Amino acid sequence: MADTPDLTQTPPTIYDVARMAGVSIASVSRVLNGRRNPREETRERVLQAVAELGFVPDGAARALSGRLKEVVGVVIRRVRWTTTSDGGFAEEDESLQFTDVLNRGIELAAQRRGFNLLVSSVDADDHDASRRLLALARKSDGLILHDRVLEPDQLDELARRVPIVTLANVATRTTTNVHSDNTSGMQALAVHLLADHGYRSIGYLAGLADSPDSLARRETLAAEAAVAGAVLMAGPEWQGNYYATGGARVIEQLLADGTTLPRAIACANDQTALGVMYALAQHGIDVPGDVAVAGFDDIPMARHLRPQLTTVRQPIQEIGTCAFDVLHSMIGGGAPAARDVLLPTRLVIRASCGCPTISPPRRLP
């Protein structure tokens, strides 16, 4: 990480001036460039912020302040790995259906506002991520980050350059986080599996090791398993990566090691569950007769699996729409109503958990 740029040394930007003065970027532009006659109160606030920050507008800054780029950068975290096992898993390069639906929500909201998207991806082990995001920030009016691609302190420093909305349940001092309610969603799923079905052992097949969402779901499941007196299997050998091949790889390795599988498996997301169900079928293990399986997300594919997948529905497209709307407000100089925007989840009961029929989504209390 020695080549990571030191964002703390970057000069103040027009975004900093607008944020400190509590006005829009356009208002800062009018004051600095003498366009129209801004209100005296606005002029004084802008000039005071300029003085306190030591902001010196150069040609590029004036160009930026005079006209927004009308571009938002969207950053996705990708996972790439290989394995030499006889199972034949290839290099990871799957498309997450969750990401596709989420990006559609961002895109629809952006189109309504006349904005375009710059979509970029970084690998999970990309040590140059901060430099790449810095370059993307220069081309954008704001950033939406799907996953945890920077450490919180780096994220705060980058947010001094452009407004940032995160979708990875990462709380910082200067960014706004839009995400779904992991706790209530996993609670509802755990109660259904452990209390309604009475399963006495349950595994949790995790997402990425540093994913706040995956960790939150695991903690909730662990708490509910303790209350129910059920055995939870969630050690390092249950570490996935949010992809179907990651879920299949874990099951293949557990079976190769002679591990007795739990009665139910809750997965960090639906694509992991897809891989789990595929691997179980390859070994003649019946779902849900031998092992019940559940996911989290309710991606389109969940209802087309056989058996159909019991899962927790996130309002995926709405998360994207909400994220852009919040970011657009921040780009205009407004302060977000909240630094943490929480959207509700629903338990969707289908057949993979052992229920005989499909039920409509059950709204959580």
Question: Could you say what each language-model-derived stretch is?
Answer:
Residues I144-Q154, N169-T175:
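Acidic, Gly/Pro-rich loop/turn segments at junctions of secondary structure
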Residues F55, V122-D126, H146-E151, Q271:
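Short beta->alpha connector loops
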Residues D128-R132, D153-Q154, G246, V250:
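Short acidic active-site motifs
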Residues V56-R131:
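Amphipathic helical "hinge" segments at domain boundaries
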